[in-house]
Swiss-Prot record:
Record's subunit section: Homotetramer.
UniProt-listed Gene3D superfamilies: 2.70.98.10, Galactose-binding domain-like, Glycosidases, Immunoglobulins
Cofactor(s) this protein cannot do without: Mg(2+); Na(+)
EC top class named in words: hydrolase
Cofactor note: Binds 2 magnesium ions per monomer. Binds 1 sodium ion per monomer.
One annotated Gene Ontology cellular component of this protein: beta-galactosidase complex
Protein name: Beta-galactosidase
Binding site for Na(+): D209, F617, N620
Active-site residue list: E477, E553
InterPro entries in UniProt: B-gal_small/dom_5 (IPR004199), Bact_Beta-galactosidase (IPR050347), Beta-gal/glucu_dom_sf (IPR036156), Gal_mutarotase_sf_dom (IPR011013), Galactose-bd-like_sf (IPR008979), GH-type_carb-bd (IPR014718), Glyco_hydro_2 (IPR006101), Glyco_hydro_2_AS (IPR023232)
EC identifiers of the protein: 3.2.1.23
């Protein structure tokens, strides 16, 4: 008897009897009466509908409002609930997580299990959701055939009843559970009841770094199949060595009653037909009866067949050119009449590891990947098509070509969209035991083998027809045990067309075809006990190691992070066996919550009263929860771009462009170039880009650099745009860019200016004399008393405090322009990377923030050591020395020289000396609180988005203008943000600053950022806070739990000097 023919127990068990077995605490019981896994079915009854992928009348959705009752434990559910709704039941949408609808609370933890660790036991207080709904069926469904119910995702375990009769049980939150309802259905109204448990023994295998939520969170539908029907379909493509021909191999199995399986008259009367379509063109077709060749001495399979179609000159599938065919598999009866048809998108592509390289269609691929959780700020883990498509389009637009389904099989629609739009996918089993000690405790326990096994094998059986899936993953962070080795072999036997990866046990066990470490660094070894992480350059050179290395996680993008990302891409392009990786991760996993006034905000761990929790560690995304970009997304886009540029010469001006596309011509690209002087274009042009895959071409842009009529920095900007829209991008989408600083040509005033100067020279001389006389009348004035030193020029007055030595006021027409004095600044509001794993209950002394705290950086006591004034012939100079100490230990010394001239300018030279005992400071700079609030900020420097010394590959030097509010990056957990580096001019209202500096400008002070837990709690302060840095430490980002700022980006010198010129335009 096949599994499809298993009938329910003849004696129906009562609800208390069923619950008393506590199946949810038995790892060897993962299901009762659940049907075998298979690819998604639609059961079309005509070929054209299957070929065109029309909605199938044989499917009926059960999404919508269900009746819902909540209990704190399953034993509290009244027995009569399985037959009728309870009086207190309320409507609840399906799909949804019940925690987002007022029941129970979501819990965020990373490693720690949210329940006491006592596998397979779970707490007696086990939140339980009771769902029910009524439905009616077409009479034809009841007259013949089989009706199934399919739950695409239920967390974490559930029991099912139909019309008061128990149907079955299932666990594994991320794979479909399918049951035959046929014996329980009746004419008219039918009632489905589902009891969902929050915790089960399966929860010990689902310890992923994510929100822990419950409920029916994916689609529910009914499917009607004929009595004799297609049971499984496996599609594979095999390409010739030259990729000029292919075999399409289809293995199809038919459900036939077991008593008829050995009757050749029965089995031989059914035929299977495969038709391959390219759009509306029939490319190939083959039909043959059921049955295979003899498998062993007992003979062949009689309920399945293998069909092989040869295709000449197939159009190949890749992420760059995702060409899809459509295979329609039809089951025919002895009269050649269609019984049913199933259809799948087919991509002809080959995945292989050859000579130490992962290759797609014979070409070594560079994985531009990202890890993605299924997450939406409003709906949690219930994701609709619009959200899925939004993620894919954003990934494609920002030069991603791969995604890892971290850490579980995704919604079935995700793979279809990846097939269609072109993304390589790592499909990962729903297994993580990170909170076990050791992690391999369960994977080495035979009693858990079946639970592990089903999560891998059922994933493969559901998803293996998708061309986008190029790698299978055995799960995440579960150590390494005998179970992994066994499942690795199972996959290699059942699907020899794809490699397998698994990071557990050190990323280099026999259970992985790919070295897939997480957070290994480019040049730095991390010799952890048992599982060392070598530098990626070193790893590929270890003895007897020939596998490709693809980081399964790297570049931890938590908050203001992602520093040093460009270093990885320099290594990837330098060493062929370093084939990229998957950034952690795509989206900030924050949930929409509401404060006491009903106002929404983005919440993280602990905001729902959830314990235990790991606070803001859920927010590691390249995009905010609403999918608006973090600045780090642009850095990824630029580093991963498919075109690389080099400047060959400046006279003539020639550049070289290399295409890193493996398969597509650059037939929709236009090259734009501009020569920029101080942010203004002086020469520009454009031309079509015609590059073959993996080719380079030189482009002659100009015969010589333009003659300049004013001094300044000269830059060459190039960018590539797509003139026409594509399925994933709008017209004029910018896909790549680069910038070079050009050598400075001689400054040659224009002839018009020269002639005008000669003609008007006498008048100019007279004007200059008048201007000099006016300057004498409005010379710099100096006033001193016991409390202040004042320097006055026309309507401006600079006031110094003799006590602090600071510029404590800048008067303009008797109006104060400073709310806080101009002073040194050496600290920043800690980044997540600065904090590391330090929390209130656990202090990591190695974290930057702890080192700064211990050294007293946040409690510095300032003293004015000296204050000198010199009134020179054309200026006033004030020299001040400041000492900073903690607990009477001198830590920093700064020497400021202020020069005031007769143009109303204040130029400050700052020299800072750092004690050798002090940890490297976060910044060397100054800050003040301006009284002004101007709507716009303009600057000449790197922009337009936020950038830091170790994250500025994507930023470009130019003249930028943004609204003030956009100068603050609204990270959900407030921290240092908004810096713009390598600035030469800053204009804010009437203020102008010049020099070579970094700056940040905002309505929020560093102090407020330091003490505020959430972005929505920040309160705009009076005026504007201006931070000017001569030097700023990098942000780091190789990971977020250990110091990861590279030594080149740490302020390790003992002395620093910078200069800033301030001016207020009266």
């Amino acid at each position: 008897m096949t599994s499809q023919e298993k009938v329910p127990f003849q004696v129906q068990l009562s609800l208390p009897q069923i619950l008393s077995r506590r199946d949810w605490e038995n790892p060897q019981i993962t299901q009762y009466h659940r049907l075998e896994a298979h690819p998604p079915f639609h059961s079309w009854r005509d070929v054209e509908s299957a070929q065109k992928d029309r909605p199938s009348p044989q499917q009926q959705t059960l999404n919508g409002l269900w009746s819902f009752s909540y209990f704190t434990q399953p034993e509290a559910v009244p027995e009569h609930w399985v037959r009728c709704d309870l009086a207190e039941a309320k409507p609840l949408p399906v799909p949804a997580n019940w925690q987002l609808h007022g029941y129970d609370a979501p819990i965020y933890t990373n490693i720690q299990y949210p329940i006491p660790v006592n596998p397979p036991r779970v707490p007696d207080l086990n939140p339980t959701g009771c769902y029910s709904r009524d439905f009616t069926l077409e009479p034809s469904w009841l007259a013949s055939g089989k009706t199934r119910i399919i739950f695409d995702g239920v967390s974490s375990a559930f029991y099912l009843w139909c019309n008061g009769q128990w149907v079955g049980y299932s666990q594994d939150s991320r794979l479909p559970a399918e049951f035959d309802l046929t014996p329980y259905l009746q004419a008219g109204s039918n009632r489905i009841a589902v009891l969902v448990l929050r915790w089960s023994d399966g929860s010990y295998l689902e310890d992923q770094d994510m929100w822990r939520m419950s409920g029916i969170f994916r689609d529910v539908k009914l499917l009607h199949k004929p009595e004799i029907h297609l049971r499984d379909i496996h599609i594979m493509t095999h390409l010739s060595p030259e990729f000029t021909s292919a075999n399409l191999e289809v293995m199809a199995a038919v459900n036939i009653p077991s008593l008829q399986l050995n009757d050749p008259q029965v089995t031989g009367s059914y035929q299977l037909r495969v038709q391959l379509w390219l759009a509306d063109k029939l490319v190939a077709s083959l039909q043959q009866p059921l049955g295979t060749q003899a498998i062993d001495e007992r003979g062949p399979y009689t309920d399945r067949t293998q069909l092989v179609l040869r295709i000449d000159q197939p159009l190949l599938w890749s992420a760059e050119q995702p060409t899809l065919y459509r295979a329609v598999v039809s089951l025919l009866n002895h009269q050649q009449e269609l019984i049913e048809a199933e259809a799948y998108d087919v991509g002809f592509r080959q995945v292989a590891i050859h000579q130490g390289l992962l290759k797609i269609n014979g070409k070594a691929v560079l994985i531009r990947g990202v890890n993605r959780h299924e997450h939406h700020p409003q709906t949690g883990q219930a994701i609709d098509e619009e959200s899925l498509l939004q993620d894919i389009l954003l990934m494609k637009q920002h030069n991603f070509n791969a995604v890892r389904c971290s850490h579980y099989p995704n919604h079935p629609l995700w793979y279809r969209l990846c097939d269609r739009y072109g993304l390589y996918v790592v499909d990962e089993a729903n297994i993580e035991t990170h909170g076990m000690q050791p992690m391999s405790r369960l994977s080495d326990d035979p009693s858990w083998f079946s639970a592990f096994s089903e999560r891998v094998t059922r994933m493969v059986q559901r998803d293996r027809n998708h061309p986008c899936i190029i790698i299978w993953s055995l799960g995440n962070e579960s150590g390494h045990g005998a179970t992994h080795d066994a499942l690795y072999r199972w996959i290699k036997t059942n699907d020899p067309t794809r490699p397998v990866q698994y990071e557990g046990g050190g990323a280099n066990t026999l259970a992985t075809d790919i070295l897939c470490p997480m957070y290994a660094r480019v040049d730095e070894d991390q010799p952890f006990p048992a599982v060392p992480k070598w530098s990626i350059k070193k790893w590929i050179g270890l003895p007897n190691e020939s596998r490709p290395l693809i980081l399964c996680e790297y570049a931890h993008a938590m908050g203001n992070s992602f520093g040093g990302f460009a270093r990885y891409w320099q290594a990837f392009r330098q060493y062929p066996r370093l084939q990229g990786g998957f950034i952690w991760d795509w989206v900030d996993q924050s949930l929409t919550h509401h404060n006491d006034h009903g106002q929404p905000y983005w919440a993280y761990g602990g905001d729902f009263g959830d314990t235990p929790n790991d606070r803001q560690f859920c927010m590691n995304g390249l995009v905010f929860p609403d999918r608006s970009p973090h600045p780090s997304l642009y850095e990824a886009q630029c580093a991963q771009q498919f075109f690389q540029f080099s400047l060959l010469s400046t006279t003539p001006l020639v550049i070289n462009i290399t295409s890193e596309y493996l398969f597509r011509e650059s037939d929709n690209e236009q090259l734009y170039w501009r020569i920029m002087l101080e942010g203004e274009s002086v020469l520009e042009g454009s031309q079509p880009l015609n590059l073959s895959p993996e080719s380079s071409q030189c482009y002659r842009l100009a015969e010589k650099l333009p003659t300049l009529n004013k001094p300044g920095q000269l830059w060459l900007n190039v960018e590539i745009r797509q003139p026409k829209e594509t399925p994933w991008s709008p017209a004029q989408h910018r896909s790549a860019w680069h910038q070079w600083r050009l050598p400075q040509p001689l400054f040659s005033p224009s002839s018009d200016l020269t002639n005008a100067t000669a003609h008007y020279a006498p008048q100019l001389q007279h004007n200059l004399q008048l201007q000099h006389n006016r300057q004498l009348q409005h010379d710099l004035q100096l006033q001193q008393d016991e409390q202040h030193i004042k320097v006055t020029y026309q309507q401006q007055c600079w006031q110094f405090s003799r006590q602090t030595g600071r510029l404590d006021q800048w008067w303009v027409a008797d109006k104060p322009m400073l709310l806080r004095p101009l002073q040194d600044q050496f600290v920043r509001a800690p980044l997540d990377n600065d904090i590391g794993i330090s929390e209130a209950t656990h202090i990591d002394p190695n974290a930057w923030v702890e080192r700064w705290k211990k050294a007293g950086m946040y409690q510095l006591q300032q003293r004015c050591l000296s204050l000198h004034v010199d009134h020179l012939s054309h200026s006033v100079q004030i020299s001040a020395e400041y000492g900073y100490e903690f607990e009477q230990e001198p830590l920093l010394h700064s020497h400021w020289v202020y020069r005031f001239d007769r143009h109303g300018r204040m130029t400050i030279d700052v020299n800072v000396r750092i004690a050798t005992s002090l940890p490297a400071p976060a910044r060397i700079g100054m800050c003040c609180q301006l009284a002004d609030i101007s709507p716009t900020v303009e600057w000449l420097g790197l922009g337009p988005h936020e950038n830091y010394p170790d994250r500025q590959l994507a930023a470009q030097y130019g003249h930028w203008s943004l609204p003030l509010e956009q100068m603050h990056t609204a990270y959900i957990f407030p921290s240092e943000n908004g810096l713009r580096c390598n600035t030469h001019t800053l204009n804010y209202g009437r203020w102008t600053l010049t020099g070579d500096f970094h700056f940040g400008i905002s309505r929020y002070s560093t102090q407020q950022l330091m003490v505020t837990s959430h972005q929505h709690l920040l309160e705009p302060e009076e005026g504007t806070w201006l931070n000017i840095d001569g030097f700023h430490m990098g942000v780091g980002g190789d990971d977020s739990w250990s110091p990861s700022v590279h030594i080149d980006d740490i302020l390790t010198r003992e002395t620093y000097q910078y200069q800033i010129c301030w001016q207020y335009k009266v």
